[in-house]
Amino acid sequence: MAMTFHLDVVSAEEQMFSGTVQSIQVSGSEGELGIRPNHAPLLTAIKPGMIRIVKQHGEEEVIYLSGGVLEVQPGAVTVLADTAIRGSDLDEARALEAKRKAEAHMNSSHGDVDFAVASAELAKAIAKLRVIELTKNAM
């Protein structure tokens, strides 16, 4: 039997996932993180992106995260997300439109603040599209 740990993925709206998993992959503030059983304790910010969950029996699930916090403790991992959406629930047309608007905003931005806001929106839209693509490929 594979080594496992307990994972909770919680957003402000709902608990997205709670169960036993083999591993997760998530975008931390310092880069990509792979968490497996017996990982060292850790607390880090999460960038907009996805969490790839490998469940207890090997099934995979992908969830979009708009940002948040990851806490790793012995035997348990908690993700507190600003927003969490299952890949199958994302709307590709809306994500493409958000990407287009963010790119247009970046091209017309006047100043660092406008550019930073547009850049953050673009990163979220690209992350959603990536999750949609991975979800489609898994089906």
Curated annotation (Swiss-Prot):
Thylakoid found in the keyword field: no
The entry's keywords: ATP synthesis, Cell inner membrane, Cell membrane, CF(1), Hydrogen ion transport, Ion transport, Membrane, Transport
GO CC, any one term: plasma membrane
Listed Pfam families: ATP-synt_DE (PF00401), ATP-synt_DE_N (PF02823)
Entry GO MF terms: ATP binding; proton-transporting ATP synthase activity, rotational mechanism
Protein's cellular compartments: Cell inner membrane
Recorded topology in the membrane: Peripheral membrane protein
Keyword Transport in record: yes
Function: Produces ATP from ADP in the presence of a proton gradient across the membrane.
Subunit structure and binding partners: F-type ATPases have 2 components, CF(1) - the catalytic core - and CF(0) - the membrane proton channel. CF(1) has five subunits: alpha(3), beta(3), gamma(1), delta(1), epsilon(1). CF(0) has three main subunits: a, b and c.
Family to which the UniProt record says this protein belongs: Belongs to the ATPase epsilon chain family.
Protein name: ATP synthase epsilon chain
Naturally occurring in which organism (per UniProt): Erwinia tasmaniensis (strain DSM 17950 / CFBP 7177 / CIP 109463 / NCPPB 4357 / Et1/99)
High-level lineage: Bacteria, Pseudomonadati, Pseudomonadota, Gammaproteobacteria, Enterobacterales
